[in-house]
Curated annotation (Swiss-Prot):
GO cellular component: sarcoplasmic reticulum lumen
General function of this protein: May play a role in the regulation of calcium sequestration or release in the SR of skeletal and cardiac muscle.
Residue span of region 10 X tandem repeats, acidic: 199-470
Protein name per UniProt: Sarcoplasmic reticulum histidine-rich calcium-binding protein
UniProt xrefs under InterPro entries: His-rich_Ca-bd_rpt, Hist_rich_Ca-bd, HRC
Family per record: Belongs to the HRC family.
Region called 2 X approximate tandem repeats, residue ranges: 59-100
Predominant location category: other
Sequence repeat segments: 59-79, 80-100, 199-224, 225-253, 254-282, 283-310, 311-339, 340-367, 368-395, 396-423, 424-451, 452-470
Annotated spans, Disordered: 44-770
4 X approximate tandem repeats: region residues: 471-585
Protein's gene: HRC
Biased composition (Low complexity): 44-58, 746-757
Length: 852
């Protein structure tokens, strides 16, 4: 043992010189001559016969006597493996970490004593840990060596044992510069030619298995550890280090990762269930493995380190993935943004129905950017299903284009207030160009806004029936759908309640078709004074299409205000307006002037069957500019109907309701009359003159009726208010079973000088139930009596001396005591309360005095 140190030192020098100077062929021959067994002492490390074998062993003693520079040369050039416990230089670390990057830390930092622990056991544990991730498949042939050669990799071990020793010098010489960052693509070929050092060590290790003795000294064990480090460093094919490597390997792992990612043309290495520490080691060797291995290295579930690479390529994959974004139906919000990038193109080419189903709100914004193009090309039905409210705003942007292509009337139904402004801008174009159907089914409120955004385009194309299904209008919604009754279609099926105001908001624009009465839907949008663009189209000269968006504030309009406002206020107050509820839509068919008016409960439904005059109960009030030109006969016809409606009007339940009903009486008359003004008739200019003549007459009559109705309703309203007050009082009394205190204003005051008995009789417990003023002592007769005792109120006695009784006031003392008792003792409904009631009667009898 004493001489082994210098001997190993000498052998180490020779080995280093030989590896550096001799050609690869000579070195291979020397290696193959049997020097390997002693060189690769595995666990026991039997003493080798030759000096070179001992030098290859790289004993700790040799290192202890070597300078760092010599160690670097010998170790790095000869074996390319650095035992970190003996190396103090960062360059050594760089060589090792960059070159093989998978030295177990356990061996890097082992002291000689630490190395005495069973190397084979550590190797086995470490080997098993590395096999766990699933890399053991590379070298099942070497599984038998795991116990002894714990750090040997599995891959290609058995195949290359013959060539290991001969290839080793060449490999080492090339590996040394590579450790410093010289790993380049050109060296991949060299790596492929070279058998991984692991295999070289395996070859020697197997020869050493026969020579291993159990009597290995500590120095042998240190050598074994030393070579184990080298074996494990050279373990390129095996991903055995992916097992339980510590976090210090992370840094080395990432050094090689650059090469790995550059050369990874195949699948990203999906590493199985390796932990984060495994990922970093696994990726150290992955560069080499992937450089040599262009086939798929399918390692199950890729860990987080793979994800970063995977995402690098994902961008390209997503850029090429143009097909998946086509499903606009139930796409989630994250998909919407990409999906809609391509949607514009698809929608531009889509001349058929673009059935957009339940697109979410985020889809709507992008989807509708391109929708303009789609709708310009979309000559067929644009069946837009359940699109939400957010689409409305963008839809109107493109409506102009769609409406410019349409040539016929576009009957717009229920447009929201915000849509009124835009809708009217494009409505002129839409009404000029409307040719085809825009079949919009059961669009909800949110659908109305979108549907009608695009309806401009659809309705402009709408010569046929625009079968707008049931438009569901929510009362008091400012944004009610643009369910415009398009192209003179009957929205017969549209039983839209409360749509009257909305449906008619936009319909006022030249829905006057030659053969039919114009479907003028006059919309009272709350607080909207936007009046129509009287569009009279060429031969279909319709009545002025005015969109009367007037405030239906019926409760606040006084009779005087109605008269001053002309017919505008009256129309706003049309019988359809109950309080703030908008009346249902009025839809008139082209061939039939019948109105299908489904009204809010309490509203009068008028189905006027005039083919010439669609007897719509026009919501808007007609100022002279707003009034159409219906024939006089139609004016009178509606006038009669108005009178019929006004007659049965009954006063509202209270205050605001009364006001709305009163106004309804006058406004219904005017509304229907005004509605008739806006119905385009088959007669053109001749009838317009007739309409003009009838307007002045109607105005006068309407004003008269309005004044009369206001006068009639005023007394009724007042009477009704009184009745309601009385009813409320009765209800309050009914709710309080122990109501006592009478109302002093009720007029039931006892006459002056009345006896206590009389007052007691007047204010018995039964009588006290009538009163709603509750105080303590609900049944207490004292309280009742005292509150009603006029004698006490007029008593001239000295209040300070209540003990005295005056002749005029006989009950002062009684009334004085009563409140004290009630406040202190008497609880409503309690025993004392009942007792006090009985006591009251007794006292009343005792104090009873005959009247003077």
């Amino acid at each position: 043992m004493g001489c082994r140190g210098p001997w190993l030192h000498t052998c180490l020098l020779w080995a280093a010189v030989a590896s550096l100077l001799l050609p690869p062929a000579v070195t291979q021959q020397l290696r193959g001559a049997g020097l390997g067994p002693s060189t690769w002492i595995n666990n026991a490390g039997a003493p080798g016969p030759s000096g070179e074998a001992a030098a290859a062993g790289l004993g700790h003693h040799g290192h202890s006597h070597r300078s760092p520079g010599e160690e670097n040369e010998d170790v790095s050039m000869e074996n390319g493996h650095h035992f970190w416990s003996h190396r103090d230089h960062g360059e050594t670390d760089d060589e090792v970490s960059r070159e093989y990057g998978h030295q177990p830390q356990g061996h890097r930092y082992h002291s000689p004593e630490a190395g005495d622990e069973s190397v084979s056991e550590e190797g086995v544990h470490r080997e098993q840990a590395r096999q766990a991730p699933g890399h053991g498949g590379h070298g099942e042939a070497g599984a038998e060596d795991l116990a002894e050669h714990g750090s040997h990799g599995h891959g290609h071990e058995e195949e290359d044992e013959d060539v290991i020793s001969s290839e080793r010098p060449r490999h080492v010489l090339r590996r040394a510069p590579r450790g410093h960052g010289g790993e380049e693509e050109g060296e991949e070929e060299e790596e492929e030619e070279e058998v991984s050092p692991e295999h070289r060590h395996r070859g020697h290790g197997k020869e050493d298995e026969e020579d291993e003795d159990d009597d290995s000294t500590e120095s042998d064990r240190h050598q074994a550890h030393r070579h184990r480090g080298h074996r494990e460093e050279e373990d390129e094919d095996d991903d055995d280090d992916e097992g339980d490597s510590t976090e210090s390997d992370h840094h080395q792992a990432h050094r090689h990762r650059g090469h790995e990612e550059e050369e990874d043309e195949e699948d990203d290495d999906d590493e199985g269930d390796s932990t984060e520490s495994d990922r970093h080691q696994a990726h150290r060797h992955r560069g080499h493995r992937e450089e040599e291995d262009e086939d798929d290295d399918d390692e199950g579930d890729s860990t987080e380190s793979d994800r970063h690479q995977a995402h690098r390529h994902r961008g390209h994959r997503e850029e090429e993935d143009d097909d998946d974004d086509d499903d606009e139906g139930d796409s989630t919000e994250s998909d919407r943004h990409q999906a809609h990038r391509h949607r514009g193109h698809r929608e531009e080419e889509d001349e058929d129905d673009d059935d957009e189903g339940d697109s979410t709100e985020s889809d709507r914004h992008q989807a509708h950017r391109h929708r303009g193009h789609r709708e310009e090309e979309d000559e067929d039905d644009d069946d837009e299903g359940d699109s939400t409210e957010s689409d409305r705003h963008q839809a109107h942007r493109h409506r102009g284009h769609r409406e410019e292509e349409d040539e016929d009337d576009d009957d717009e139904g229920d447009s929201t207030e915000s849509d009124h402004h835009q809708a009217h801008r494009h409505r002129g174009h839409r009404e000029e160009e409307d040719e085809e159907d825009d079949d919009e089914g059961d669009s909800t409120e949110s659908d109305r806004h979108q549907a009608h955004r695009h309806r401009g385009h659809g309705e402009e194309e709408d010569e046929d029936d625009d079968d707008e299904g049931e438009h569901h209008h929510v009362p008091h919604r400012g944004h009610r759908g643009h369910e415009e009754d398009d192209g003179g279609d009957d929205d017969d099926g549209d039983d839209s309640t409360e749509n009257g105001h909305q449906a008619h908001r936009h319909q006022g624009h030249g829905k006057e078709e030659a053969e039919v009465t114009s479907d003028e839907h006059h919309h009272h949008v709350p607080d909207h004074g936007h009046q129509g663009h009287g569009d009279k189209e060429g031969e279909e000269e319709g009545v002025s299409t005015d969109h009367w968006h007037q405030v239906p504030r019926h409760a606040h309009h006084g009779p005087g205000g109605e008269e001053e406002g002309g017919e505008e206020e009256l129309t706003v107050k049309a019988g359809h307006h109950v309080a703030s509820h908008p009346p249902p839509g009025h839809r008139s068919r082209e061939g039939h002037a019948e109105e299908h008016q489904t009204e809010v409960p309490g509203h009068h439904q008028h189905r006027m069957g005039d083919t010439d005059t669609s007897a719509e109960r026009g919501h808007p009030a007609s100022s002279p500019r707003q009034q159409g030109h219906p024939p006089e006969d139609t004016v009178h016809h509606h006038r009669g109907s108005l009178k019929e409606e006004v007659g049965p009007e009954s006063p509202g339940p209270a205050g605001v309701k009364d006001g709305s009903r009163v106004k309804r009486g006058g406004s219904e008359e005017e509304e229907e009359q005004k509605g008739t003004h806006h119905h385009s008739l088959e007669d053109e200019e001749d009838e317009e003159e007739g309409h003009g003549r009838s307007l002045s007459q109607e105005d006068q009559e309407e004003e008269d009726r309005r004044g009369e109705s206001a006068k009639v309703q005023a007394p009724l309203r007042h009477h009704r208010e009184e009745e309601e007050e009385e009813e409320e009082e009765e209800e309050e009394e009914g709710r309080l079973p122990f109501t006592i205190i009478p109302n002093p204003l009720s007029g039931r005051e006892a006459a002056g000088g009345a006896s206590s008995e009389e007052s007691a009789e007047d204010t018995g417990p039964e009588d006290t139930q009538e009163y709603g003023n509750y105080q303590q002592g609900s049944l207490c007769g004292y309280c009742t009596f005292c509150n009603r005792c006029t004698e006490c109120e007029h008593c001239h006695c000295d209040e300070d001396s209540m003990g005295e009784h005056c002749d005029q006031c006989q009950h002062c003392q009684f009334c004085y005591l009563c409140p004290l008792v009630c406040e202190t003792v008497c609880t409503p409904g309690s025993y004392v309360d009942y007792f006090s009631s009985s006591l009251y009667k007794a006292l009343a009898d005792m104090l009873e005095t005959p009247e003077p």
